[in-house]
């Protein structure tokens, strides 16, 4: 399959920035913090923590990609709908990192659970709340395929826990929203209020997203917090309904990421009247407020979008059928982020992984091998042992680039 990528490029339309940053109010029952694990080597905050001292009901919607990050895999195994904390890292997606990525995340979970348990034991009440690793959720965003820097992150957890703050002023929210960014130009924050019965409830939300934004979400993370008392089953139903007309209705570059996550947490600190049914009229105002907040964040993501000319040949082999090979090939070729990497002479093969995963075809991550030129860059669900980024970077400067994707599932090719 041969494609001239210059046919795909259009001048980037400059969009005006949205208005001033919205001031978020504190959510009772939530503590937040962010610190630098020096993942960017520039001292910026790159890990953040959201802690619920008394726990929180939660609901989440994840990527539709068939290749998912270790953090998404972890969260999907959590069967409880009541959690104690969410930890987020940027710079590294922890995707296509193999068993090491999963093990690294587990080590982080153990360290975090111990640190939070210690914090709990130091309260004035003296009560010790044992926080298990199954009480924790994780989110990662960044480059696909790079070794997960779990030791760097793990070493900063005590400081991250120490810096947890109950009072979230606008500077704390801004700092934390900035800590989850990757290629974003600016942090994204939104706030709404509504009533459930006669009780006023608050909803605060932050998001990141700039590249890989498409219907069905994409490198997009959004975390929403409310002090309302709403059971997880109703949070899930409302969230799915709201996402359908907000986050899943935007597109920047048509790519679905491996790390997408939108989650809502309810601390229950406002003692609104009990909700027994999803059709309860008392939920209508909350749903409308959540929709306004989500649409606000989704629009901020669109405004913050990313940006790329060469002759590229993509061969897909080892597929189960011709149509599967063709679909995967075009999924990669039509990916604007893949084209951006080509035009920018960037050896970011993780974008090929992303495009394979979002094709919708049946694949087995452990069997995929990716070659760029004569260089094997990925195989067995991880970066290739012989991978040499400097040699690949030189190859990316060529005017003609060849890519081979071997699915190792069948005999069809395209």
Summary of predicted features, one role per range:
Residues 120-127:
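Short, low-complexity intrinsically disordered segments enriched in small and basic residues
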């Amino acid at each position: 399959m041969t494609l001239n990528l210059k046919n795909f490029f259009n001048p980037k339309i400059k969009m005006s920035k949205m208005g001033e940053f919205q001031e978020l109010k504190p959510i009772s029952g939530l503590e937040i913090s962010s610190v630098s694990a020096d993942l960017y080597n520039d001292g910026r905050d790159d890990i953040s923590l959201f802690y619920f001292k008394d726990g929180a009901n939660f609901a989440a919607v994840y990527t539709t990609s068939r290749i998912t990050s270790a953090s998404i895999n972890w969260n999907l195994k959590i069967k409880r709908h009541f959690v104690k904390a969410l930890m987020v890292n940027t710079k590294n997606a922890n995707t296509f990192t193999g068993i090491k990525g999963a093990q690294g995340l587990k080590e982080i979970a153990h360290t975090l659970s111990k640190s939070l348990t210690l914090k709990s034991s130091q309260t004035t009440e003296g009560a010790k709340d044992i926080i298990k690793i199954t009480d924790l959720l994780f989110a990662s965003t960044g480059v696909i395929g790079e070794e997960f820097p779990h030791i760097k992150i793990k070493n900063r957890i005590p400081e991250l826990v120490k810096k947890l703050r109950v009072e979230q002023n606008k500077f704390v929210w801004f700092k934390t929203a900035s800590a989850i960014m990757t290629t974003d130009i600016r942090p994204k924050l939104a706030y709404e209020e509504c009533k459930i019965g006669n009780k006023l409830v608050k909803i605060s939300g932050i998001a990141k997203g700039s590249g890989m934004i498409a219907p069905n979400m994409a490198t997009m993370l959004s975390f929403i917090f409310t002090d309302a008392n709403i059971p997880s089953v109703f949070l899930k139903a409302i969230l799915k309904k709201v996402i359908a007309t907000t986050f899943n209705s935007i597109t920047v570059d048509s790519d679905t990421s491996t790390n997408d996550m939108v989650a809502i947490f309810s601390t229950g600190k406002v003692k609104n009247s009990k909700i027994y049914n999803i059709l309860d009229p008392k939920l209508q105002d909350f749903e409308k407020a959540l929709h306004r907040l989500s649409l606000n964040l989704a629009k901020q993501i669109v405004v913050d979008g990313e940006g790329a000319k060469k002759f590229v040949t993509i061969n897909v082999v080892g597929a189960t059928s011709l149509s599967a090979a063709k679909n995967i090939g075009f999924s990669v070729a039509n990916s604007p982020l893949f084209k951006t990497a080509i035009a920018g002479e960037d050896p970011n093969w993780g974008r090929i992984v992303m495009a394979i995963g979002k094709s919708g075809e049946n694949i087995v991550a452990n069997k995929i091998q990716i070659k760029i030129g004569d260089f094997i860059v990925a195989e067995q669900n991880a970066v290739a042992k012989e991978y040499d980024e400097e040699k690949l970077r030189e190859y990316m400067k060529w005017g003609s680039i060849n890519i081979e994707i071997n699915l190792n599932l069948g005999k069809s090719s395209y």
